[in-house]
């Protein structure tokens, strides 16, 4: 959990030389980037980073859940290492819904198994509706959008995809830029999970290949 900041040669290649491990080098470089390294961007030096498991970006930083100063990751590639770690986590369970409380499922059975960021599917559920919050005490799930035509009580399926870069641990991440980066998902991984809130998350000249 200790920070390691290169002041002179602040780039990914230098961190790889220091740590000898691609993923650890990226995590330590990202940690330094968000902790006043006197650099606003992290150059990946055109390198392809083999990712063995989803990278929890907030855990890599370790101390912040809010960050609102411009930072950039640029010039490289991320590619998953094939394996079951990328398989989506799927939970099917029952819950209650009322149009008077349109963004909440109540009486959710086994609510603790549902991950924030999960895609919600079921009767009356539109496209791209996700889990914003889970309350294991009240047995409720907060939704990103309201439902239309859902029954008062029914089954729902919650699918949590696995992302190369997962920023969902941040409560608010603003002015963050990913520039000239390719995400080679290879049919295994998803690309990027955004933070819960944040102004101007910018993908610039990037490719996300399924």
Please name every model-derived segment.
Residues 52-55, 82-86, 127, 186-193, ...:
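Short glycine/acidic-rich loop motifs that flank beta-strands on beta-rich extracellular proteins
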Residues 23-29, 58-64, 162-168, 184, ...:
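Glycine- and acidic/polar-rich repeat regions and solenoidal domains
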Residues 35, 64-67, 146-148, 167-175, ...:
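Right-handed parallel beta-helix/beta-solenoid
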Residues 3-14, 21, 87-101, 109-112, ...:
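Small/polar beta-strand repeat architecture
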Residues 1-3, 9-12, 18-19, 23, ...:
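Detector for repetitive beta-architecture
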Residues 40, 115-118:
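Surface-exposed loop/turn positions
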